[in-house]
């Protein structure tokens, strides 16, 4: 009977990415091939866009942020990374993610970080809605997506995949993709540190991206849609 319970626990860990009260997680599954890594960082950032350079205790990860397709989610990530969005864990202008741990790692599945408590239970003191785009799927290694505890409960926690995880589509908001450093993602172990996040803006549109406005507009749009749905049900 103990064997059955252990099996069920392992399966539930594999098929969900949550901001959970359980700090002890199961590590399992295979390794990714190194050919998913692109090694020339200069070439990777020649394309206009918003990039996040995540410095870790294992090396650097560079991510292209999908600010045009998921502006609210990207704005939240940048706002926290640069200390622009008010939260109850860090003071104004203090980078939120610097010094936090990757508190949950499941081999051949994903690495998860962004919890200010280092346990998977923390958040920035607010929640914001899901933001799904039909072109953004968990269809490859190196997908950057939001961890949550249910619909519309996004905060600061995020994960990066080791492989495609299609069962997470339309449950977790994808907002970026690794363009360099997938080998670093694969090396990250539980309790390794995220040392800093540097946001790099390439091109006019990226430089004009307004973090606070994009975050506020996304929430307003969600509230508007909710009111319209409620009204439709009443009619």
What are these regions (language model features)?
Residues 7-16:
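Bacterial N-terminal signal peptides
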Residues 1-4:
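Positively charged n-region of N-terminal signal peptides that target proteins for export
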Residues 17-235:
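Cyclophilin-like peptidyl-prolyl cis-trans isomerases
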């Amino acid at each position: 009977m103990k064997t059955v319970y252990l099996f069920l626990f392992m399966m539930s860990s594999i098929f969900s990415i949550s901001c959970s009260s359980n700090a002890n997680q199961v590590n399992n599954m295979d390794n990714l091939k190194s050919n998913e890594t692109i090694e020339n960082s200069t070439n990777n950032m020649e394309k206009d866009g918003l990039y996040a350079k995540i410095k870790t205790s294992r090396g650097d990860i560079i991510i292209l942020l999908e600010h045009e397709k998921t502006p609210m989610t990207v704005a939240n990530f940048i706002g926290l990374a640069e200390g622009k969005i008010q939260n109850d864990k860090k003071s104004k202008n203090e980078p939120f993610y610097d010094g936090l741990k990757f508190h949950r790692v499941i081999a051949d599945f994903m690495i998860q970080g962004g919890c200010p408590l280092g346990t998977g239970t923390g958040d920035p003191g607010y929640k914001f809605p899901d933001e799904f785009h039909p072109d953004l799927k968990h269809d490859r290694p190196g997908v950057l997506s939001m961890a949550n505890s249910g619909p519309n409960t996004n905060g600061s926690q995020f994960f990066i995949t080791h492989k495609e995880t299609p069962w997470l589509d339309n449950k977790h908001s994808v907002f970026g993709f690794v363009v360099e450093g997938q080998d670093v993602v694969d090396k990250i172990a539980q309790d390794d540190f995220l040392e800093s996040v540097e946001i790099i803006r390439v091109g006019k549109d990226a430089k004009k991206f307004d973090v606070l406005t994009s975050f506020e507009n996304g929430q307003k749009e969600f509230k508007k849609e909710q009111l319209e749905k409620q009204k439709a049900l009443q009619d």
